[in-house]
Amino acid sequence: MLSPRQGLLRPVGCGVEELRRRRREREADPAVPVVSPAGDRGKGERRSSGQPSSRLAAPRDTADLHQELCLYTLGNLIVESEAGRRQLLPQGIVPALASCIQSPHLPVLEALGYALSQLLQAKEAPKKIIPSVLASSIPQHMLRLLQPGPKLNPGVAVEFAWCLHYIICSQVNNALLITHGAVSTLGLLLLYLAGSVQSPEDAGLELLVCPVLRCLSNLLTEEAVEAEGGQVQLRDERVVVSVFILLQFLLQKHPSLLPEGLWLLNNLTANSPSICTSLLSLDLIKPLLQLLPVSNVVSVLVLTVLCNVAEKGPAYCWHLWPGPLLSSLLDTLALSDTDVVGQSLELLQLLFLYRPEAAQAFLQQSGLQALKRHEEEAQLQDRVLALQQTALHR
Protein backbone atom coordinates (compact mmCIF):
# COMPACT_ATOMS: atom_id res chain seq x y z
CA MET A 1 0.00 0.00 0.00
CA LEU A 2 1.13 3.51 -0.73
CA SER A 3 1.40 5.94 2.13
CA PRO A 4 -1.67 8.18 2.37
CA ARG A 5 0.72 11.10 2.37
CA GLN A 6 1.87 10.37 -1.13
CA GLY A 7 -0.09 12.14 -3.79
CA LEU A 8 -0.21 13.05 -7.44
CA LEU A 9 0.21 16.62 -8.56
CA ARG A 10 -2.44 18.24 -10.67
CA PRO A 11 -1.78 18.26 -14.44
CA VAL A 12 -2.09 22.03 -14.68
CA GLY A 13 0.20 24.98 -15.29
CA CYS A 14 2.30 26.13 -12.37
CA GLY A 15 3.28 29.74 -13.02
CA VAL A 16 6.36 29.20 -15.18
CA GLU A 17 4.87 30.61 -18.37
CA GLU A 18 6.38 34.04 -17.75
CA LEU A 19 9.81 32.42 -17.38
CA ARG A 20 9.36 30.56 -20.63
CA ARG A 21 8.33 33.75 -22.41
CA ARG A 22 11.40 35.67 -21.22
CA ARG A 23 13.75 32.88 -22.32
CA ARG A 24 12.16 32.71 -25.74
CA GLU A 25 12.41 36.48 -26.15
CA ARG A 26 16.12 36.36 -25.34
CA GLU A 27 16.66 33.73 -28.03
CA ALA A 28 14.37 35.18 -30.69
CA ASP A 29 15.41 37.38 -33.60
CA PRO A 30 14.84 40.96 -32.35
CA ALA A 31 13.06 41.81 -35.59
CA VAL A 32 10.52 39.02 -35.18
CA PRO A 33 9.00 38.93 -31.67
CA VAL A 34 7.81 35.65 -30.23
CA VAL A 35 4.10 35.38 -29.50
CA SER A 36 3.85 33.95 -26.02
CA PRO A 37 1.23 31.34 -25.22
CA ALA A 38 -1.37 32.51 -22.73
CA GLY A 39 -3.28 30.85 -19.93
CA ASP A 40 -2.36 27.28 -19.09
CA ARG A 41 1.16 26.16 -19.78
CA GLY A 42 1.93 25.96 -23.46
CA LYS A 43 -1.65 26.42 -24.70
CA GLY A 44 -1.89 29.13 -27.29
CA GLU A 45 -0.26 30.38 -30.44
CA ARG A 46 3.46 30.26 -31.00
CA ARG A 47 5.25 31.49 -34.07
CA SER A 48 8.64 30.56 -35.37
CA SER A 49 10.99 33.41 -36.18
CA GLY A 50 11.46 31.97 -39.64
CA GLN A 51 15.21 32.55 -39.33
CA PRO A 52 18.03 30.03 -38.91
CA SER A 53 18.92 29.61 -35.24
CA SER A 54 22.42 30.34 -34.00
CA ARG A 55 22.09 27.27 -31.73
CA LEU A 56 22.15 24.80 -34.61
CA ALA A 57 24.97 22.29 -34.65
CA ALA A 58 24.56 21.71 -38.40
CA PRO A 59 23.50 23.84 -41.39
CA ARG A 60 19.80 23.92 -42.11
CA ASP A 61 18.15 23.58 -45.46
CA THR A 62 14.75 24.71 -46.66
CA ALA A 63 13.18 21.35 -45.83
CA ASP A 64 14.18 21.62 -42.17
CA LEU A 65 12.82 25.15 -41.91
CA HIS A 66 9.60 24.05 -43.59
CA GLN A 67 9.32 21.14 -41.15
CA GLU A 68 9.74 23.48 -38.18
CA LEU A 69 7.09 25.89 -39.45
CA CYS A 70 4.69 23.02 -40.15
CA LEU A 71 5.10 21.70 -36.62
CA TYR A 72 4.36 25.08 -35.04
CA THR A 73 1.35 25.49 -37.32
CA LEU A 74 0.18 22.01 -36.39
CA GLY A 75 0.54 22.81 -32.70
CA ASN A 76 -1.57 25.94 -33.07
CA LEU A 77 -4.24 24.07 -35.05
CA ILE A 78 -4.39 21.36 -32.38
CA VAL A 79 -5.28 24.01 -29.80
CA GLU A 80 -7.93 25.63 -31.96
CA SER A 81 -9.83 22.71 -33.46
CA GLU A 82 -11.17 19.55 -31.84
CA ALA A 83 -12.45 18.43 -35.24
CA GLY A 84 -8.94 18.82 -36.61
CA ARG A 85 -7.51 16.70 -33.81
CA ARG A 86 -10.00 13.94 -34.57
CA GLN A 87 -8.64 13.70 -38.10
CA LEU A 88 -4.99 13.56 -37.08
CA LEU A 89 -4.85 10.03 -35.64
CA PRO A 90 -6.24 8.19 -38.68
CA GLN A 91 -3.97 10.29 -40.88
CA GLY A 92 -0.91 8.99 -39.02
CA ILE A 93 0.10 11.91 -36.81
CA VAL A 94 1.85 9.71 -34.21
CA PRO A 95 4.13 7.88 -36.71
CA ALA A 96 4.90 11.24 -38.32
CA LEU A 97 5.94 12.73 -34.98
CA ALA A 98 7.96 9.59 -34.19
CA SER A 99 9.88 10.20 -37.41
CA CYS A 100 10.39 13.91 -36.75
CA ILE A 101 11.75 13.32 -33.25
CA GLN A 102 14.83 11.71 -34.81
CA SER A 103 15.79 15.00 -36.49
CA PRO A 104 19.29 16.32 -35.64
CA HIS A 105 18.05 19.93 -35.78
CA LEU A 106 17.21 21.52 -32.43
CA PRO A 107 14.58 24.00 -33.71
CA VAL A 108 12.71 21.12 -35.35
CA LEU A 109 12.81 19.15 -32.09
CA GLU A 110 11.61 22.13 -30.08
CA ALA A 111 8.75 22.73 -32.52
CA LEU A 112 7.90 19.03 -32.33
CA GLY A 113 7.83 19.20 -28.55
CA TYR A 114 5.45 22.14 -28.74
CA ALA A 115 3.07 20.36 -31.14
CA LEU A 116 3.19 17.14 -29.12
CA SER A 117 2.52 18.99 -25.86
CA GLN A 118 -0.63 20.52 -27.37
CA LEU A 119 -1.78 17.10 -28.53
CA LEU A 120 -1.18 15.54 -25.12
CA GLN A 121 -3.24 18.23 -23.38
CA ALA A 122 -6.37 17.54 -25.43
CA LYS A 123 -9.30 16.35 -23.34
CA GLU A 124 -9.51 13.14 -25.36
CA ALA A 125 -5.76 12.44 -25.04
CA PRO A 126 -5.86 9.80 -22.25
CA LYS A 127 -8.15 7.52 -24.26
CA LYS A 128 -7.37 8.27 -27.87
CA ILE A 129 -3.90 9.79 -28.16
CA ILE A 130 -1.57 8.82 -25.32
CA PRO A 131 -1.92 5.03 -25.82
CA SER A 132 -0.73 5.48 -29.41
CA VAL A 133 2.15 7.69 -28.30
CA LEU A 134 3.23 5.14 -25.69
CA ALA A 135 3.10 2.36 -28.29
CA SER A 136 5.49 4.30 -30.53
CA SER A 137 9.20 5.06 -30.19
CA ILE A 138 8.46 8.60 -28.96
CA PRO A 139 8.87 7.90 -25.20
CA GLN A 140 12.37 6.43 -25.63
CA HIS A 141 13.44 9.41 -27.76
CA MET A 142 11.93 11.85 -25.25
CA LEU A 143 13.97 10.31 -22.45
CA ARG A 144 17.07 10.41 -24.64
CA LEU A 145 16.58 14.15 -25.15
CA LEU A 146 16.28 14.59 -21.38
CA GLN A 147 19.63 12.94 -20.64
CA PRO A 148 21.76 15.44 -18.68
CA GLY A 149 25.07 16.57 -20.07
CA PRO A 150 26.64 19.02 -22.51
CA LYS A 151 24.26 18.00 -25.31
CA LEU A 152 21.16 18.84 -23.27
CA ASN A 153 19.34 21.71 -24.97
CA PRO A 154 17.14 23.76 -22.59
CA GLY A 155 14.47 24.64 -25.15
CA VAL A 156 14.05 21.07 -26.37
CA ALA A 157 14.26 19.60 -22.87
CA VAL A 158 11.60 21.94 -21.46
CA GLU A 159 9.11 20.97 -24.16
CA PHE A 160 9.64 17.24 -23.73
CA ALA A 161 9.69 17.42 -19.94
CA TRP A 162 6.19 18.91 -20.07
CA CYS A 163 5.16 16.26 -22.61
CA LEU A 164 6.37 13.60 -20.19
CA HIS A 165 4.45 15.30 -17.38
CA TYR A 166 1.17 15.19 -19.33
CA ILE A 167 1.68 11.52 -20.15
CA ILE A 168 2.45 10.64 -16.53
CA CYS A 169 -0.58 12.54 -15.23
CA SER A 170 -2.83 10.59 -17.59
CA GLN A 171 -1.79 7.38 -15.75
CA VAL A 172 -2.37 5.42 -18.95
CA ASN A 173 0.74 3.26 -18.58
CA ASN A 174 3.35 4.76 -16.28
CA ALA A 175 4.83 1.31 -15.71
CA LEU A 176 6.03 1.40 -19.32
CA LEU A 177 7.82 4.71 -18.77
CA ILE A 178 9.44 3.31 -15.65
CA THR A 179 10.59 0.26 -17.61
CA HIS A 180 12.16 2.61 -20.17
CA GLY A 181 14.22 4.17 -17.36
CA ALA A 182 12.22 7.33 -16.70
CA VAL A 183 12.98 7.41 -12.97
CA SER A 184 16.71 7.01 -13.53
CA THR A 185 16.79 9.67 -16.27
CA LEU A 186 14.77 12.16 -14.23
CA GLY A 187 16.83 11.48 -11.11
CA LEU A 188 20.06 12.22 -12.97
CA LEU A 189 18.46 15.31 -14.50
CA LEU A 190 17.48 16.49 -11.02
CA LEU A 191 21.12 16.25 -9.89
CA TYR A 192 22.21 18.09 -13.03
CA LEU A 193 19.69 20.89 -12.51
CA ALA A 194 20.76 21.39 -8.90
CA GLY A 195 24.30 21.98 -10.10
CA SER A 196 23.28 24.24 -12.97
CA VAL A 197 20.34 26.48 -12.05
CA GLN A 198 22.50 29.11 -10.33
CA SER A 199 24.80 29.50 -13.33
CA PRO A 200 24.03 32.44 -15.65
CA GLU A 201 25.28 30.36 -18.57
CA ASP A 202 22.45 27.87 -17.95
CA ALA A 203 19.61 30.34 -17.40
CA GLY A 204 17.21 28.34 -19.57
CA LEU A 205 17.55 25.29 -17.35
CA GLU A 206 15.50 26.91 -14.57
CA LEU A 207 12.45 26.29 -16.75
CA LEU A 208 13.07 22.55 -16.42
CA VAL A 209 12.80 22.52 -12.64
CA CYS A 210 9.01 22.49 -12.36
CA PRO A 211 8.20 19.69 -14.85
CA VAL A 212 11.07 17.51 -13.61
CA LEU A 213 9.93 17.85 -9.99
CA ARG A 214 6.38 17.00 -10.99
CA CYS A 215 7.33 14.01 -13.11
CA LEU A 216 9.42 12.48 -10.35
CA SER A 217 6.80 13.21 -7.68
CA ASN A 218 4.09 11.47 -9.66
CA LEU A 219 6.18 8.48 -10.71
CA LEU A 220 7.08 7.83 -7.07
CA THR A 221 3.42 7.01 -6.40
CA GLU A 222 3.55 4.11 -8.84
CA GLU A 223 3.97 0.60 -7.49
CA ALA A 224 6.10 -0.22 -10.54
CA VAL A 225 8.83 2.05 -9.16
CA GLU A 226 9.58 -0.48 -6.44
CA ALA A 227 9.54 -3.39 -8.88
CA GLU A 228 12.07 -1.66 -11.15
CA GLY A 229 14.26 -0.47 -8.29
CA GLY A 230 13.38 3.17 -8.81
CA GLN A 231 13.16 3.89 -5.10
CA VAL A 232 16.65 2.47 -4.66
CA GLN A 233 17.97 4.79 -7.38
CA LEU A 234 16.55 7.80 -5.52
CA ARG A 235 17.87 6.87 -2.07
CA ASP A 236 21.21 8.46 -2.84
CA GLU A 237 21.99 11.33 -0.45
CA ARG A 238 22.75 13.46 -3.48
CA VAL A 239 19.05 13.42 -4.36
CA VAL A 240 18.16 14.93 -0.97
CA VAL A 241 20.89 17.56 -1.30
CA SER A 242 19.71 18.38 -4.82
CA VAL A 243 16.12 18.84 -3.69
CA PHE A 244 17.23 21.29 -1.00
CA ILE A 245 19.43 23.21 -3.43
CA LEU A 246 16.41 23.57 -5.69
CA LEU A 247 14.20 24.55 -2.75
CA GLN A 248 16.61 27.35 -1.87
CA PHE A 249 16.73 28.42 -5.51
CA LEU A 250 12.93 28.50 -5.73
CA LEU A 251 12.67 30.37 -2.42
CA GLN A 252 14.93 33.10 -3.77
CA LYS A 253 13.69 33.30 -7.36
CA HIS A 254 10.25 31.68 -7.65
CA PRO A 255 8.67 31.09 -4.21
CA SER A 256 5.31 30.21 -5.77
CA LEU A 257 6.94 27.00 -7.05
CA LEU A 258 8.16 25.83 -3.63
CA PRO A 259 5.25 23.36 -3.28
CA GLU A 260 6.57 21.46 -6.31
CA GLY A 261 9.85 20.66 -4.55
CA LEU A 262 8.13 19.90 -1.27
CA TRP A 263 5.74 17.46 -2.96
CA LEU A 264 8.74 15.55 -4.26
CA LEU A 265 10.34 15.57 -0.81
CA ASN A 266 7.04 14.36 0.64
CA ASN A 267 6.82 11.44 -1.76
CA LEU A 268 10.49 10.60 -1.25
CA THR A 269 10.15 10.45 2.54
CA ALA A 270 6.76 8.72 2.67
CA ASN A 271 8.10 5.18 2.27
CA SER A 272 11.85 5.59 2.60
CA PRO A 273 13.56 5.43 6.00
CA SER A 274 16.90 6.00 4.25
CA ILE A 275 15.75 9.35 2.83
CA CYS A 276 14.49 10.33 6.28
CA THR A 277 17.87 9.34 7.71
CA SER A 278 19.57 11.56 5.14
CA LEU A 279 17.41 14.51 6.18
CA LEU A 280 18.55 14.06 9.76
CA SER A 281 22.21 13.24 9.12
CA LEU A 282 22.58 16.23 6.79
CA ASP A 283 20.98 18.49 9.42
CA LEU A 284 18.23 19.64 7.07
CA ILE A 285 15.38 19.91 9.58
CA LYS A 286 16.18 23.53 10.43
CA PRO A 287 16.19 24.64 6.76
CA LEU A 288 12.82 22.92 6.38
CA LEU A 289 11.39 24.76 9.39
CA GLN A 290 12.58 28.05 7.94
CA LEU A 291 10.12 27.55 5.09
CA LEU A 292 7.08 27.51 7.41
CA PRO A 293 6.34 31.26 7.18
CA VAL A 294 6.26 31.29 3.36
CA SER A 295 2.59 30.31 2.99
CA ASN A 296 -0.05 27.99 4.43
CA VAL A 297 0.37 25.57 1.51
CA VAL A 298 4.12 25.41 2.09
CA SER A 299 3.57 25.00 5.85
CA VAL A 300 1.29 21.99 5.36
CA LEU A 301 3.81 20.30 3.06
CA VAL A 302 6.75 20.97 5.40
CA LEU A 303 4.79 19.56 8.34
CA THR A 304 3.77 16.52 6.28
CA VAL A 305 7.40 15.77 5.43
CA LEU A 306 8.26 16.03 9.13
CA CYS A 307 5.39 13.65 9.94
CA ASN A 308 6.89 11.19 7.46
CA VAL A 309 10.14 11.38 9.40
CA ALA A 310 8.55 11.17 12.86
CA GLU A 311 6.38 8.17 12.06
CA LYS A 312 9.49 6.11 11.29
CA GLY A 313 9.90 5.62 15.04
CA PRO A 314 11.73 6.59 18.23
CA ALA A 315 15.21 6.78 16.70
CA TYR A 316 14.02 9.43 14.26
CA CYS A 317 12.15 11.43 16.88
CA TRP A 318 15.29 11.51 19.01
CA HIS A 319 16.79 13.69 16.29
CA LEU A 320 13.72 15.93 16.07
CA TRP A 321 13.71 16.90 19.75
CA PRO A 322 15.34 18.70 21.54
CA GLY A 323 15.73 21.34 18.89
CA PRO A 324 13.75 24.11 17.18
CA LEU A 325 10.84 21.87 16.18
CA LEU A 326 8.70 22.32 19.31
CA SER A 327 8.86 26.11 19.32
CA SER A 328 8.04 26.15 15.60
CA LEU A 329 4.98 23.97 16.21
CA LEU A 330 3.80 26.26 19.00
CA ASP A 331 4.00 29.10 16.49
CA THR A 332 1.89 27.19 13.97
CA LEU A 333 -0.75 26.52 16.64
CA ALA A 334 -1.23 30.29 16.84
CA LEU A 335 -2.41 30.32 13.22
CA SER A 336 -6.03 30.10 12.12
CA ASP A 337 -5.60 27.86 9.07
CA THR A 338 -7.15 24.50 9.97
CA ASP A 339 -4.97 22.52 7.55
CA VAL A 340 -1.76 23.90 9.05
CA VAL A 341 -2.98 23.43 12.63
CA GLY A 342 -4.28 19.93 11.88
CA GLN A 343 -0.93 18.82 10.46
CA SER A 344 0.83 20.37 13.47
CA LEU A 345 -1.41 18.34 15.80
CA GLU A 346 -0.55 15.14 13.94
CA LEU A 347 3.18 15.85 14.18
CA LEU A 348 2.93 16.66 17.90
CA GLN A 349 1.02 13.42 18.50
CA LEU A 350 3.82 11.42 16.85
CA LEU A 351 6.50 13.34 18.72
CA PHE A 352 4.83 12.78 22.11
CA LEU A 353 4.33 9.10 21.32
CA TYR A 354 8.03 8.49 20.73
CA ARG A 355 9.51 11.27 22.91
CA PRO A 356 7.47 11.62 26.14
CA GLU A 357 9.93 14.28 27.33
CA ALA A 358 8.74 16.50 24.50
CA ALA A 359 5.21 16.40 25.95
CA GLN A 360 6.53 17.73 29.27
CA ALA A 361 8.36 20.54 27.48
CA PHE A 362 5.16 21.32 25.56
CA LEU A 363 3.21 21.70 28.80
CA GLN A 364 5.92 23.90 30.31
CA GLN A 365 5.78 26.20 27.27
CA SER A 366 2.01 26.85 27.62
CA GLY A 367 1.09 24.24 25.04
CA LEU A 368 -2.33 23.57 26.57
CA GLN A 369 -3.27 27.22 26.24
CA ALA A 370 -2.24 27.10 22.58
CA LEU A 371 -4.55 24.12 22.07
CA LYS A 372 -7.54 25.74 23.77
CA ARG A 373 -8.05 28.27 21.00
CA HIS A 374 -8.90 25.39 18.64
CA GLU A 375 -11.23 23.43 20.96
CA GLU A 376 -14.37 24.83 19.32
CA GLU A 377 -13.29 24.21 15.72
CA ALA A 378 -15.29 21.27 14.38
CA GLN A 379 -12.51 19.99 12.10
CA LEU A 380 -9.95 19.99 14.91
CA GLN A 381 -11.89 19.14 18.08
CA ASP A 382 -11.16 15.41 18.16
CA ARG A 383 -7.46 15.84 17.44
CA VAL A 384 -7.11 18.64 19.98
CA LEU A 385 -8.73 16.49 22.68
CA ALA A 386 -6.56 13.49 21.78
CA LEU A 387 -3.39 15.58 21.95
CA GLN A 388 -4.38 17.12 25.28
CA GLN A 389 -4.86 13.66 26.76
CA THR A 390 -1.57 12.42 25.32
CA ALA A 391 0.35 15.41 26.67
CA LEU A 392 -1.15 15.10 30.16
CA HIS A 393 -0.56 11.36 30.48
CA ARG A 394 2.95 10.92 29.05
Regions inferred by a protein language model and the residue ranges of each:
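Elongated alpha-helical scaffolds that mediate protein-protein interactions in large eukaryotic proteins
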Residues: 38, 44-69, 77-95, 106-111, ...
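Exposed, low-complexity/repetitive linear segments and helix-based recognition motifs
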Residues: 14-15, 22-26, 65, 107, ...
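Helix-loop junctions that connect tandem helical modules in alpha-solenoid scaffolds
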Residues: 55-64, 97-107, 141-153, 189-205, ...
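Alpha-helical solenoid repeat architecture
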Residues: 38, 46-51, 68-82, 96-100, ...
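Intrinsically disordered, low-complexity regulatory regions
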Residues: 1-51, 337, 345-359, 363-394
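Extended acidic/polar regulatory tracts at the flanks of large eukaryotic scaffold/adaptor proteins
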Residues: 2-5, 17, 23-26, 174, ...
